[in-house]
């Protein structure tokens, strides 16, 4: 737990060596020993090579992608162990399996590693559900869902009424393959943790089944100009979000519609900065 760290303030500012050391304090002695055994030789090799320019960029990418793939392999192995146990105990048909994450990830797309931006690579979240009694194997759903829908879904499956204070909508109505007519048509996103270690500018936005509007905002930059810029994408014709259509006359109606919806989200969610 963060509250149990020796240096909580350093951990919150982990872009420096003190913060890095504080993050190691989260590990048990056994975990720390395993971490050092794995990374110390590679780190020392990196320091001794004193890489520059393109060689440094390639090294960073290889380090990142290998750790990323190893993480996927580890998760796959552990999920496999869980499924093997359920099969052994005869519990597979009496268990709902949900495979998901808190976001997607960038591996160089948009010149970025990590997450946080509203572009599709991190905005789209993995979600696989196995529920033989309700969901046909291999079926797909294109409805707009959010992670705030998970808890109401679990309660619904268990036959428990959702508390009034809980946001989100049960996904159970989607299990049959049809999307209810009153299902949500838009998603709202807001990132506001700036300045911070990742230095991602504040932005919010709205997405429907095809289009996305993003608004970047914030304090003055090095040119003494207040940051305020917008991006509009057609995700059907431009899935990689490389062609900004904002202020394109051909998309004026779409831009106006999305802006109106974004403004409504800001009011409904009591957003006080944008």
Segments the model singles out, each with a brief description of its role:
Residues 1-145, 157-165, 222-227, 249-253:
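Active-site-proximal cap/lid insertion segments
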Residues 103-109, 148-151, 156-231, 235, ...:
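C-terminal cap/loop subdomain of S1 sulfatases and analogous C-terminal strand-loop tails that border
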Residues 241-245:
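Carboxylate-dense, calcium-coordinating segments in secreted/extracellular and ER-lumen proteins
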Residues 175, 246-249:
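A general structural motif at alpha-helix termini
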